[in-house]
Amino acid sequence: MSVLLIAEHNNKELRPFTLNAVTAASQIDQDVHAVIIGHNSEEALKALSALPAVKKVISVEAPHYENFTAENFAPIIVKLAENYTHIVSSANTFGKNLMPRIAALLDTSQVSDITKVISNDTFVRPIYAGNAFATVKSNDKKKCVTIRPTSFDPCESTGGSALIEKVDGLEEFVQTKFIKREEVKSDRPELGTARIVVSGGRGMQSGDNFKLITEVADKLGAAIGASRAAVDAGYISNDHQVGQTGKVVVPDLYIAVGISGAIQHLAGMKESKVIVAINKDGEAPIFSVADYGLEADLFEALPQFLAELNKLNTIQK
């Protein structure tokens, strides 16, 4: 038995969640091999081979792998899967696009979004928007598993020296054509990996009022999140959405402002280490998961909070 981990990268460096996926993979079996598919990805390959938990790295290089299209990735991974019992990736956009194709080609059932490894064939995954957890056992000979990155600690990133094997790629899948990629560039921390997240909900009342969230986030060095209601209302773009249909976050500090706390939103943030809720409705569900709750008008509370943060900054200077 051995595990093949699909490494996520940008051809220059590993994506942070790859380290979390390695931890999950090593809980399935200590013999973890990783495959890195790309073009001119030598730096990412070097970083991957330095992970102590990875015993072997398979490198597949070709120009048509540069843009990470799942139609090109799936066939080569299926070919490599002949020697493995488990294929593992993160349950993010990358993994959700790729792993179902791999599972279909292997004619196996996918086990999705696991939060815990019980044994090499039994896993725990959330259901009902995170309000319950199911224990799932897979009897398939080959198991395709996606892991919720925030449920596993990142592995050590240095000190390893994995064996590197270079493998030729397959022919390009010509029915799909890559057009372009648009990436949001920001000086802020990435929402999925930020230590502090400040989120606003429908209670912000308008997009212009979200500048209050922005100011608080600037002072705290935080990422900006939002509820689906705020996104649907057009207050902020959907790449900030936290929840069942958005990003799942587990920061050290999550500040929810004007968010009532629908179960879909709670599913994306209730595992945060410390949760602070500000809402004028004392019966709002968000208070049921909050470590600290402030029943107040956010348009009065946030300016006062900013004033105190400014005082702290002045003292520190």
Task: Describe every region a protein language model picked out.
Residues 1-317:
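N-terminal glycine-rich FAD/FM-binding segment characteristic of electron-transfer flavoproteins
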